[in-house]
Amino acid sequence: MSVESMVQGMIDALTDALGDAAKHDKGNSAAGTRVRKAMQGAKAAAQNVRAQVQGDKNSR
């Protein structure tokens, strides 16, 4: 998988979380849980991107 597609996947996931973030700001607690879950996924995806970039760098 390319780094570009990995980053695009992160962007798509975070864009999807915007709706829940707005609901959370209006007081919806369940939406806040979904936002936290999306952020945890973004953290994991960012770690994968970092590992991929480092691996690519080391192999060049």
Give the residues covered by each predicted segment.
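N-terminal acidic leader/helix
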Residues: 1-20
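Membrane-interface helix-loop junctions in multi-pass transporters/channels
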Residues: 4, 56-59
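Residue-level recognition of oxygen-bearing side chains
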Residues: 6, 30, 44
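Short, charged, amphipathic alpha-helical segments
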Residues: 8, 32-37
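A structural signal for well-ordered alpha-helices, especially hydrophobic packing surfaces
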Residues: 14, 18-21, 39, 43-46, ...
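Short, surface-exposed loop/turn segments at secondary-structure junctions
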Residues: 25-32, 60
